[in-house]
Each structure stands twice: as C-alpha cells, then as structure tokens.
C-alpha cells in the first residue's frame, strides 16, 4: 500500500478536539470501597442507578482474549450502525468527501452517507456478486475516504474473493471497511488475523447474528490503535448500557455459538435441498450466511402470499441485480418446515 497516513484522512475539527471524559475514565481499577460523588447519580442502589462503564473493560477484555487482539484495537457500539456512523463522522467531511459502496448490499451504508451529507458512489457488483475492481478503482478520487465491503454480503449471501479485497487494501489510501456481520456462518475465515498488517483496514462484527443477542444491540469495530483512538474521541461516553454489557458478557461466557452455528448451517443445507423441488423458484444463490437469496417468477406475488400465511421474509426486488429475488432467513427446524410446506402449496 502506498502513502497511507491516517492523519491525512481524519477531519481537522476531529483531529484537534478533546474527547469528553468522565471522572471515572481516569481510573483503571475500581474497588468496592470507592465513593462515587462525581456524576450526579442517584445514590440509592437498585442495580441500575450508576452509569455504565464508559470503556466497557470487562466485555472488551473477554472479546480481546477470544479474538487474540489488543483491547486498544477495538471499539464497541450500540449496534454496528453506531460504529459505522462514527467512522463517517470522524473521517468524512460533509458536502466534500465521498464513499464507495457495492450494491446490492446492506442499505445502512447509503443511509449513513445521506445523514452525514457524504456522496455515495455506487459501483455495482458483477453478475456473480463479486466486486468489480476496475470500476471501483476508476471511481476513486482525492475525496474518496472509505470503501465498504460486506462479506458475506447482505442480501446476496456470498463472500467476496480474497484477491479482490487484497487489491483494494494494497492500492487504496483511504479506509477499507469489511462488514463481517455474517462471518461465523461462512466457510471463509475472518480478516481479523491481518488487522495489524493493513493500517487502512477496519472490520465490523456483531453479537446480533451468530451470538443470538440482537436485542442487546452490540456492534464491534476492529482497527489499528490509531484509528480506534480517533473514534473514541467522538464516541458517546455511555453508549452501551449496564444491562447490555452484563448480559453480553454472561452469554459469551456460556457461549453456545458453535452449537447454534452448526444447526443453522445444517438447516441452510436442508432448506436449499427443499427449495430445489419448488417449480416457481428459478434460482437459489450460494450462501455463506444465515439466509438464502432465491429468484422466483414473481417476487411480489409470492411475498404477499407468504404474508397472508403469517410468514415474513424479505422482498429484495428493489435492489440492483436482485429482480424478483426474495431473502429467506434460516429459522428453527419447525419454522423452516412450515415455510417449505406453505411454498409447496402455493
């Protein structure tokens, strides 16, 4: 990679600002004997009367050990959308800079670009849903700050070619964000093991999918310590509440991740085999995620028929390259069997 310098990317007002700090940010170790008269809290204990740990030390410590990474290379957010928004706000100058996204893909990249007044350059994936590297490189200019890669991709379900990702990491002097929300369901490994090799690499993951904690809203961003330090300047001080931190840590310690992932992957295989025999399904796309994208002869019709039967899936027909496509999340064995029964009866 040529001439990457994070100081050339960060917004000037962010570069020079001082982060908000609570008094407790100054303490690395707390004891039960400490008296807290710093934050104007209600002193009467009910289990939630105190502000949460702004640094999420226990939760970060567990995740750091699990992923063999330093805590200063990690940022936790109120869902992945918060950490993605922080990346926009730290590095993209409104009404000046641009980002590149690769439709069909996760819609929040475009939404966050609009919220932050950043031009979103859309470079369509190829017919087999892979990054069109030549077109991406053509669209990069001096104001391009970020390229977003969702791999495994939502809604298509496939993982991106390693060589394509490496080409961008090595040739783009901006930030490459790889969204790995579905990585635990993929036969491909995470890019986390090379996070220290590429200072322009950011990886987002989540506890919402494989870890079954969508209700807690905890997203994770991994990057260099320099990038994390910048993002910590603008992170709200108490962005993850006590209940979420404690519940997440408890569930991680009792993790049934491998068991659930294996069941979902097995159900995914069974779902594909069942869908093959349904006449109006024209194509079943390969999936590395916990969902399957299918092409049917009339997506609106089939979507509405399923709604009438009390089954909610996602109609992705409004996405580029996804005409008449439906996205089906892999559910429990019973839910999947009900879906197949209804589809066969349509």
UniProtKB/Swiss-Prot annotation:
<keyword id="KW-0028">Amino-acid biosynthesis</keyword>
<comment type="similarity">
    <text>Belongs to the class-II pyridoxal-phosphate-dependent aminotransferase family. Histidinol-phosphate aminotransferase subfamily.</text>
</comment>
<dbReference type="InterPro" id="IPR015422">
    <property type="entry name" value="PyrdxlP-dep_Trfase_small"/>
</dbReference>
<feature type="modified residue" description="N6-(pyridoxal phosphate)lysine">
    <location>
        <position position="209"/>
    </location>
</feature>
<dbReference type="GO" id="GO:0000105">
    <property type="term" value="P:L-histidine biosynthetic process"/>
</dbReference>
<comment type="subunit">
    <text>Homodimer.</text>
</comment>
<keyword id="KW-0663">Pyridoxal phosphate</keyword>
<protein>
    <recommendedName>
        <fullName>Histidinol-phosphate aminotransferase</fullName>
        <ecNumber>2.6.1.9</ecNumber>
    </recommendedName>
</protein>
<keyword id="KW-0368">Histidine biosynthesis</keyword>
<dbReference type="InterPro" id="IPR015424">
    <property type="entry name" value="PyrdxlP-dep_Trfase"/>
</dbReference>
<dbReference type="InterPro" id="IPR001917">
    <property type="entry name" value="Aminotrans_II_pyridoxalP_BS"/>
</dbReference>
<keyword id="KW-0032">Aminotransferase</keyword>
<dbReference type="InterPro" id="IPR004839">
    <property type="entry name" value="Aminotransferase_I/II_large"/>
</dbReference>
<dbReference type="GO" id="GO:0030170">
    <property type="term" value="F:pyridoxal phosphate binding"/>
</dbReference>
<comment type="pathway">
    <text>Amino-acid biosynthesis; L-histidine biosynthesis; L-histidine from 5-phospho-alpha-D-ribose 1-diphosphate: step 7/9.</text>
</comment>
<keyword id="KW-0808">Transferase</keyword>
<dbReference type="InterPro" id="IPR015421">
    <property type="entry name" value="PyrdxlP-dep_Trfase_major"/>
</dbReference>
<dbReference type="Pfam" id="PF00155">
    <property type="entry name" value="Aminotran_1_2"/>
</dbReference>
<dbReference type="InterPro" id="IPR005861">
    <property type="entry name" value="HisP_aminotrans"/>
</dbReference>
<dbReference type="GO" id="GO:0004400">
    <property type="term" value="F:histidinol-phosphate transaminase activity"/>
</dbReference>
């Amino acid at each position: 990679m040529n001439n990457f310098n994070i100081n050339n990317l960060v917004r000037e007002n962010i570069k020079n600002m001082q982060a908000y700090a609570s008094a407790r940010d100054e303490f690395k170790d707390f004891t039960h004997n400490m008296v807290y008269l710093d934050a104007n809290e209600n002193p009467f204990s009910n289990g939630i009367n105190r502000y949460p740990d702004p640094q999420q030390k226990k939760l970060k410590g567990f995740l750091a050990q699990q992923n063999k990474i330093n805590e200063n290379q990690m940022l936790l957010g109120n869902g992945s959308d918060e950490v993605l928004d922080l990346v926009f706000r730290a590095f993209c100058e409104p009404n000046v800079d641009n980002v590149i996204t690769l439709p069909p893909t996760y819609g929040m990249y475009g939404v966050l670009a609009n919220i932050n007044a950043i031009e979103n350059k859309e470079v369509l994936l190829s017919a087999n849903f892979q990054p069109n590297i030549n077109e991406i490189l053509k669209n990069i200019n001096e104001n391009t700050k970020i390229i977003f890669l969702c791999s495994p991709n939502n809604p298509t379900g496939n993982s991106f070619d390693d060589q394509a990702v490496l080409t961008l990491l090595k040739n783009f002097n901006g930030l490459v964000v790889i969204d790995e929300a579905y990585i635990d369901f993929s036969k491909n490994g995470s890019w986390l093991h090379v996070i220290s090799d590429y200072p322009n690499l950011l990886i987002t993951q989540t506890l919402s999918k494989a870890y079954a904690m969508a209700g807690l809203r905890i997203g994770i961003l991994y990057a260099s310590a320099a990038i994390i330090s910048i993002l910590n300047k603008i992170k709200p001080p108490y962005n993850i509440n006590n209940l979420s931190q404690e519940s997440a840590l408890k569930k991680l310690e009792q993790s049934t991740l491998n068991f659930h992932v294996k069941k979902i992957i097995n159900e995914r295989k069974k779902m594909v085999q069942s869908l093959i025999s349904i006449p109006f399904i024209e194509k079943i796309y390969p999936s590395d995620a916990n969902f399957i994208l299918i092409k049917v002869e009339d997506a609106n019709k089939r979507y509405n028929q399923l709604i009438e039967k009390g089954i909610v899936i996602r109609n992705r027909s409004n996405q580029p390259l996804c005409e008449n496509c439906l996205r089906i999340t892999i559910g429990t064995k019973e839910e999947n069997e009900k879906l197949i029964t209804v589809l066969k009866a349509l």
